[in-house]
């Protein structure tokens, strides 16, 4: 990805990767950048970080940008792994809406309501304990609470590509087949070709005003 190459040239180094994104750490070690060629959920995560900034229960967001074609990146404070039991306790507090997390829970509600209206493949709150991390000062923060239902989204490209074409503008998904897929492995070549052809045909029909 061009964004990763630019950051690498500036001295940033890759420190992790998953199915949707790679993570780089700044030369100072104080910042982390998450870079994805396609992540329709990331704008909602950035929205949450802004809305809930005053709670000090989300990372400090230094930058967030969507590029032409759909690539996205965010820069935030670098965080460190917390103990699994701490993450579980954090999510229990959210579920119970205990006083110390009430404002965060309300911010999550607002973002989730909007996301579910706009993105059919928006997943529920991801309660994986690893999504709670620790900042340098020791405080716990919620880092990656939302996710796209990837299997369902990509299956939709085979079953109903028009649904995807309508829900996600073409200019926001040009790189949707360039995901790192570090955990689940690469796309099946035949399935990928069928996905691409189906989506291209759907885009052509939309562009010509020929809606089914």
Specify the residue positions occupied by each region the protein language model found.
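Conserved hydrophobic "DFG−1" position in protein kinase catalytic cores
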Residues: 25, 35, 75-78, 134
């Amino acid at each position: 990805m061009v964004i990763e190459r630019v950051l690498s040239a500036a001295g940033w180094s890759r420190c992790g990767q998953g199915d949707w994104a790679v993570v780089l750490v700044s030369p100072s070690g104080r910042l982390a950048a998450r870079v994805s060629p396609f992540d329709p959920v990331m704008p909602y995560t950035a929205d949450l970080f802004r809305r809930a900034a005053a709670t000090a229960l989300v990372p400090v967001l230094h930058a967030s940008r969507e590029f032409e074609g759909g690539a996205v990146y965010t820069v935030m404070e670098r965080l460190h792994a917390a103990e699994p039991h701490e993450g579980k306790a954090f999510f229990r507090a959210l579920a119970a809406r205990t006083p110390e997390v009430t404002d965060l829970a309300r911010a999550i509600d607002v973002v989730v309501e909007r996301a579910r209206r706009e993105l059919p493949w928006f997943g529920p709150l991801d309660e994986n304990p690893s999504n709670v991390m620790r900042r340098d000062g020791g405080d716990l923060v919620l880092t990656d609470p939302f996710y796209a239902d990837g299997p369902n989204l990509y299956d939709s490209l085979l079953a109903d590509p028009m649904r995807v074409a309508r829900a996600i503008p073409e200019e926001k998904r040009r790189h949707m087949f360039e995901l790192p897929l570090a955990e689940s492995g690469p796309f099946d070549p035949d399935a990928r070709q069928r996905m691409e052809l189906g989506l291209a045909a759907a885009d052509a029909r939309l562009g010509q005003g020929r809606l089914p």
